Curated annotation (Swiss-Prot):
GO terms for biological process: negative regulation of transcription by RNA polymerase II. The active site is at 134 (proton acceptor). One of its GO terms (molecular function) is transcription corepressor activity. Its EC number is 2.3.1.286. Residues 27-270 form the Deacetylase sirtuin-type domain. Gene3D superfamilies: 2.20.28.200, TPP-binding domain. This is NAD-dependent protein deacetylase SRT1. The lineage of its organism: Eukaryota, Viridiplantae, Streptophyta, Embryophyta, Tracheophyta. Its main location: nucleus.
Length: 483
């Protein structure tokens, strides 16, 4: 699947230097520089991170100027490269999740990003700690009241154009706009001002995966120098700002950041993705029967896509007289006519799309047309926290929970959260006792065991016993270890 953002950009001949050769520091020099960077981060009182496309390449999203970058291939007449995953299923990288941990510990004060992939927000970085200079392919904004809408699908347009949706505020209702800049669009003042202020305050601006060529954004990190701050750059190519930097590291960003986190004795949290679905059931009485309609839709609107769902299976375990069905086309809808006096249970099985960490998840839905269900709204942040804790503890996706329900005569609607992916980056308890060379491959990439997507199906019982035995010998608790 090609990247919609790159295809939607208007054509521009001059995109700066592309296809620049990649530079790799020797293992010895890289190790030394990582140690130096770890000291700089540890001693920083106001760390600001400035990110570019290079921090997302390990998630399957191509960069722009590298040997296989978007603009490099376009200049050679090869067109836009394909992504290894659908854009909406791209997973935050080790670097994204490390930044989340650095922010939680209070070390990282702010992130300035030139990326539009939404991976910083998807990783869990607080919105107030992020400036997205070039916009976000998954975000809409109301030009009237400035309310932002983060979607689970890619917005159809770029260039600050109108989208098909409107502001949900009852006092507003204005047509929403996309937030992604085209070539001639000016940087959003709110994001720009916040980024400038943070760079001026920073005692260290760490530039990750950016060639620092796009103006005016590329000049922001240097604002820290005026107040005695420092700049560090981690990138595979040389940048125009290298001479101004206190430290320049040529290496894979994930590898460098993994080393920094290791030396600072900080964990890299797993990425746990939660998606949302709305289920509604409406009915009308027809003599002694009830005609009912089931709908499975997006929380972003009846016409909005559900990109994480491939199909929905509807079955009736306690009613062999009711035929099961597989809904394959969105919007997912089922109409039936049944007896009013016979309650039943619907089993809804959500079959997930490619890129999810498990194949499916099922929800039981009791139906009794003679009783009206109660309405409630649960604490969303608490429910999501519990869901994520359960997913991390079990090392698998597929958990679900109801967030809210509205019951009215002849209808009920509920919103459910589903854990659709879990990815671990830092799970080896014995790593601290192992030299760095053994957990970093000689080719410059992280060992596979530090980037492991966990599916829904648990490991075999034989493998679980072997792992548990090994952990007991090491004095570890098998229940908390990844299989």
């Amino acid at each position: 699947m090609s990247l919609g953002y790159a295809e939607k950009l208007s054509y521009r001949e001059d995109v700066g230097n592309v296809g620049m050769p990649e530079i790799f520091d020797s293992p010895e020099l890289l190790h030394k520089k990582i140690e130096e960077l770890a000291v700089m981060v540890r001693e920083s009182k106001h760390l600001v991170v400035f990110t570019g496309a290079g921090i997302s390449t390990s998630s399957g999203i191509p960069d722009f100027r590298g040997p296989k970058g978007v603009w490099t291939l376009q200049r050679s007449g090869k067109g836009v490269p394909g992504a290894s995953l659908p854009f909406h299923r791209a997973v935050p990288t080790l670097t994204h999740m490390a930044l989340v941990e650095l922010e939680k510990t209070g070390r990282l004060k702010f992130v300035i990003s030139q990326n539009v992939d939404s991976l910083h927000l998807r990783s869990g970085l607080p919105r107030e700690k992020l400036a997205e200079l070039h916009g976000n392919s998954f975000k809409e904004i109301c030009p009237s009241c400035k309310k932002e809408y983060l979607r689970d699908f890619e917005i159809e347009t770029i260039g600050l154009k109108d989208t098909p949706r409107r502001c949900s505020d009852k006092n507003c209702g204005a047509r929403l706009k996309d937030t992604v800049l085209d070539w001639e669009d000016a940087l959003p003042p709110e994001e720009m001002d916040a980024a400038k202020e943070q760079c001026q305050t920073a005692d260290l601006v760490l530039c990750l995966g950016t060639s620092l060529q796009i103006t005016p954004a590329c000049n922001m990190p240097l604002l820290s120098l005026k107040n005695g701050g420092r700049v560090a750059i981690v990138n595979l190519q040389a940048t125009p700002k290298d001479k101004k930097a206190s430290l320049v590291i040529h290496g894979l960003v994930d590898k460098v950041i993994a080393g920094v986190m290791y030396m600072m004795n900080l964990r890299i949290p797993p990425y746990i993705r939660t998606d949302f679905v709305q289920i509604s059931l409406r009915n009308s009485v027809k003599k002694k029967c009830v005609r009912w309609t089931l709908r499975v839709t997006s929380i972003h609107g009846l016409r909005a896509p559900l990109p994480f769902l491939r199909s929905v299976e509807v079955s009736f375990p306690e009613r062999p007289d009711m035929k099961p069905v597989v809904l394959k086309e969105q919007p997912f809808s089922l109409q039936r006519e049944t007896s009013m006096n016979r309650p039943f249970v619907m089993l809804l099985t959500f079959n997930f799309s490619d890129g999810c960490g498990c194949s499916s998840s099922s929800i039981e839905w009791p139906v009794d047309f003679l009783k009206q269900k109660d309405s409630f709204v649960r604490d969303r942040s608490l429910v999501l926290q519990e869901l994520q804790h359960a997913a991390e503890h079990r090392s698998r996706a597929g958990q679900h929970a109801i967030l809210e329900r509205e019951g009215v005569p002849r209808a009920e609607t509920s919103i459910h959260a589903l854990v659709t992916n879990i990815v671990r980056y830092d799970t080896e308890d014995s790593k601290a006792a192992v030299p760095m060379a053994t957990w970093m491959n000689s080719n410059g990439s992280l060992s596979k065991r530090h980037m492991d997507a966990i599916g829904c199906n648990p490991a075999s019982s034989k493998k679980q016993k072997l792992v548990a035995t090994r952990h007991r010998r090491k004095g570890l608790n098998p229940a908390t270890q990844k299989v």
